[in-house]
Amino acid sequence: MMMQWKTVRQSVIAALAVTCSFMAGAAPPPVAAPAPAPVSYGVEEDVFHPVRAEHGMVASVDAAATQVGVDVLKQGGNAVDAAVAVGFALAVTHPQAGNLGGGGFMMLRTKDGNVTAIDFREMAPEKATRDMFLDAQGNADSKKSLTSHLASGTPGSVAGFTLALQKYGTMPLDKVIQPAITLARDGFTVNDALAIDLKTYGVETLPNHPTSKAIFWKQDGKPYQKGDKLVQANLAKSLELIAKDGPDAFYKGPIADQIADEMAKNGGLITKADLANYKAVERTPVSGDYRGYQVYSMPPPSSGGIHIVQILNILENFDLHTYGFGSADAMQIMAEAEKYAYADRSEYLGDPDFVKVPWQALTSKAYAKSLAQQIDVNKARPSKEIKPGNLAPYESNQTTHFSVVDKDGNAVAVTYTLNTTFGSGIVAGDTGILMNNQMDDFSAKPGTPNVYGLVGGDANAVGPKKRPLSSMSPTIVVKDGKTWLVTGSPGGSRIITTVLQMVVNTIDYGMNVAEATNAPRFHHQWLPDELRVEKGFSPDTLKLLREKGQNVAVKEAMGSTQSIMIGPDGALYGASDPRSVDDLTAGY
């Protein structure tokens, strides 16, 4: 085990050495990267056509929330105003992942080209300890980290949205939050997505807590179904408090009182001091150049940005366009590149306020070239040669992403979550607010996979005031100095590869945003050693991949991208993912 870890560590150290040698002129000049494919925006001969608008656009997982955002844009609000309005609305209409009691990340590119990242990831409470999720035998106890009051970190969504609005928005908080208040107070019609998730996932946790059951279960003992009206009066009151008193209502006022009381009575750790001390943080985005495009994504504590750039750097050494979309060779190259990135993720990534992340080494072109040289297009490298691991028993797609672009060119990409579907299933007191189970994203025990099958090390160990590692990857791509693609996705460990394929599909294969969204996806996260593919790839291609040594498994759909592309004429082209029901891209 130690030798295997040493091998991974040496790879990063070697990258630094190679980088230095490049700078010293000792290495041969790099081969010119293949050119990107011609860009498509959705012309008549394309199979799938995006939504087109001239002035502003919103893409989200929920039609009602999308319309809230479009209305804000029509009223003269900018992309940040609309994004914050959508974020609060999703907390009402998409409680599977939209939230006030969770956290996430925002990527923002202003009309003048400034790019920034807002980190509103949850934080471990002050009383959190490294071994808090281990049982008497020293093994990780997933019940504690997923469904108990210990599972919740200090929420960040309210702080993140209000910070963004205050610094980059133009509208007052009470105005952008009003649509969410109305939806909660007056009710909305339950759609297919919510009805299915209540029946499939909610039944596991929500009925176990009286305050949760009272909201999402009807008096006949059944969860709300499609077509029912769902009213959330307590959540409306919480939203009204935030509209009136700002984030202090949540972090220092009556909402904080109820959250802290809920935790104190039930063995949770979050205190009023934890809430009062929480701060959203503005960070410098991860950036990279891919075939002449600039890619901006989230820095740690998200692993997404670093590894999207890392994988793209590896892929830049191959002519994917010539191989062709869906070819066995292209999929082989991408799967092998993904293995290396996810291996590094387990060792080096964590909260940058607590651990030193080798950011420059992991995203260097030299390191990527050294990894590319190890990829055999004809033979897969077994993951056990990098590091062994175990398969987690359960996965959830329930994060949510939305993208917004306004008439002036401001662009926002937001991914936020409760972690698993409906989070811990616990509603804090009479707030109507579902609490997250984000503490499971820490490494409860080094080498043991979390709920998404991801293995972590000491860098992501539980610790007071730490933010757990995430895969969330809101991403903005720039072409010729202008915002070109705004994208992101839910999907747990598969977020990184889903967003990666949106970038590759549009740049390397020349797909329009709708084609890139509809194209079948695949994923390799190194452990388990499995190339997971959606339906839609040729059986002959899968046969060739197996012959190359890939452990191919055809499984359910991956991700739910919400993306907007900006054409050279300034027109907006958007697409919501057909893998989700009831989502919507709309503009004006």
Residue ranges of model-derived segments:
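Active-site rim segments in enzyme catalytic domains, especially the processed small/beta chain
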Residues: 92-117, 269-271, 411-479, 509, ...
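Short, small/polar residue-rich loop motifs at catalytic or cofactor-binding pockets
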Residues: 282, 396-399, 421, 470-472
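Noncatalytic scaffold domains of N-terminal-nucleophile
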Residues: 28-67, 71, 79-80, 84-245, ...
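Gram-negative bacterial Sec-dependent N-terminal signal peptides
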Residues: 2-25
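Internal maturation/activation junctions in enzymes
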Residues: 36, 318-418, 430-431, 446-447, ...
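Short, well-structured alpha-helical segments that form the helix of a local strand-helix-strand
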Residues: 80-86, 174-185, 257-260, 325-342, ...
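Extended C-terminal subregions enriched in glycine
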Residues: 466, 508-556
